[in-house]
A protein has these predicted regions:
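Glycine-rich phosphate-binding loops of nucleotide-dependent enzymes
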Residues: 2-219
Length: 219
């Protein structure tokens, strides 16, 4: 697995939010990851570049708790983990946006963002507040999507924005983006990169996974 670090001079080098020490992962006799050391600072965009089969997906799944490492440890935001569960990762502030979005097509944008964490008022779902909060979160990244529209009516780029806002709503400290530009047009990719820079400005750490070297230098 190869990686490239984008330097962020205004952030103290000692402000490391994620450290991975000697992480290995075996599947039977196959070693998918071998003694990986990796660190990233708070509010930094860190690109991981590698071809298919390089271990990028396995690495994501370890960070998000879908796989337990065979060896090694993870330090995140000052806490040490020998392995993460999905619930622990989410509580810690780690979230991932995969190429296949985790959205429910027949629900609205705001319902997807608050799914499983719905706001209540006097025993009923508080749609008004969820819609208002959703509008504000989109505005924070310079975008506008009707929070009442069903996700199935949105294009791929808009669905990706819903995933990003969903991560923001969960107070994500680290967002892992897996080949986020793969389904996008050139203009949509430029918009995505602008949003990534905005998230960085808010102190959110981004791990940006891609196999396109030319794209990495644009972020």
């Amino acid at each position: 697995m190869n990686n490239r670090l984008e330097e962020t001079p205004q952030i103290d080098n000692t402000d490391i939010i994620l450290e991975v020490h000697k992480i290995s992962k075996r599947f039977g006799g196959i070693k998918a990851l071998n003694n990986i050391d990796f660190s990233v600072r708070r509010g930094e965009v860190h690109a991981l570049v590698g071809e298919n089969g390089a271990g990028k997906s396995t690495f994501i799944k370890i960070l998000t708790g879908a796989h337990a490492p065979s060896e090694g440890k993870i330090m995140f935001d000052g806490k040490e983990y020998s392995g993460l569960t999905p619930a622990l990762a989410l509580d810690a502030g780690i979230t991932a946006i995969y190429q296949e979005f985790n959205l429910i097509p027949f629900l609205s944008v705001s319902e997807n963002i608050y799914f499983g964490r719905e706001l209540m008022k006097q025993g009923f779902l508080d749609y008004e507040q969820m819609n208002e909060n959703t509008k504000k979160m989109f505005k924070e990244i310079g975008m506008a999507i009707n929070p009442k529209i069903r996700v199935q009516r949105l294009g791929i780029a808009q669905q990706q924005l819903v995933e990003i806002v969903k991560a923001i709503s969960k107070n994500a400290k680290l967002i892992i983006m897996d080949e986020p530009s793969a389904p996008l047009t050139e203009q949509e990719t430029e918009t995505l990169h602008t949003i990534v820079r905005q998230l960085k400005g808010k102190g959110i750490t981004i791990i940006y996974i891609s196999h396109r070297m030319e794209e990495i230098f644009e972020i």
